[in-house]
Amino acid sequence: MDLLSLRTAIQSTLNSVLGTYTLANGATTPAISVRAPGESLPAGTTVSGLEVVIVREPELVPVRQYKNEQAFSRWTLYLVDWAGTNSLQDVAGDLLWAYPGSNAVSINVPRGVGPRSQMRVDITTNPETHV
């Protein structure tokens, strides 16, 4: 699965709970983005509600087989609740149901600063064969 397909599928799965990005020009868009580690949102962009951040590059997990090398792609997502109104366990559950073999872990966040809660979700997609 490529990055665009994954992003589209996740947005479709979580559409009813996604928050909103408000861009510097006032336009709004669903709060789902693809970023490299350490990359931030464009200047002037604000977030409200549930944000989903997909890490741009997947981790490759090798599967050893006779005469074929395969690798699962493990995509990392961060669910970030900026409003404190979402149950991240329920949101992560929707993703785990849609992508069997995936897992989710809560991340501690400082109280009173930034997001209310955060989870990391690792989604594993089908292997690609490399001969």
Segments from the language model and where they lie:
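Generic preference for well-ordered secondary structure
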Residues: 38, 61, 79, 105-107
